[in-house]
Amino acid sequence: SQIPLYYLDMIWHLPDRTNVFREEFDMQLQEILAKDRWIIDGNYLRTMEARIAACDTIFLLDYPVELCLEGVEERIGKPRTDMPWVETEFDEEFRQWILDFPEEQLPKIYELLEKYSGRGKEIMIFRKREEAEEFLQGREER
């Protein structure tokens, strides 16, 4: 794709495993949102509404918790383009965040999607990796 891709984790996290200040994160995000075209990867519920308001297409990966946990396990020890360090173990705080996600985060995300549905936004929800992969494969074939 010729559309620039931004990972929110790369903006928020620093290589020394600390974070940027919230104001710095927000400033960088606003600079991205001001561009004509972009793809943003990441949850960050605090800034989600601004991103939804500014975009034309939303992809929600509403995967089962078990699949999310497996995905994190598989990535341990591997370099990633979306993180500024290599995870050496499963962070327990992150594990708990994943376990709590369906009750604490997901309802708020669906509320935002409902709020913005019918406003010219294309909203795509994938519940299995295969669904997302099929969609992306179909885009590549065009």
Predicted regions and their residues:
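A structural signal for well-ordered alpha-helical scaffolds and beta->alpha junctions
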Residues: 22, 26, 91, 102-110
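Conserved nucleotide-sensing/catalytic segment adjacent to the nucleotide-binding pocket
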Residues: 6-58, 63
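A glycine- and Lys/Arg-enriched "phosphate-lid" helix/loop adjacent to the NTP-binding pocket
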Residues: 63-105
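A conserved segment at the C-terminal end of the G1
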Residues: 1-4
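Short alpha-helical
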Residues: 46-47, 67, 104, 131
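Short, charged, surface-exposed secondary-structure boundary motifs
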Residues: 15-19, 67-74, 134-136
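NTP-dependent small-molecule kinase module
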Residues: 100-142
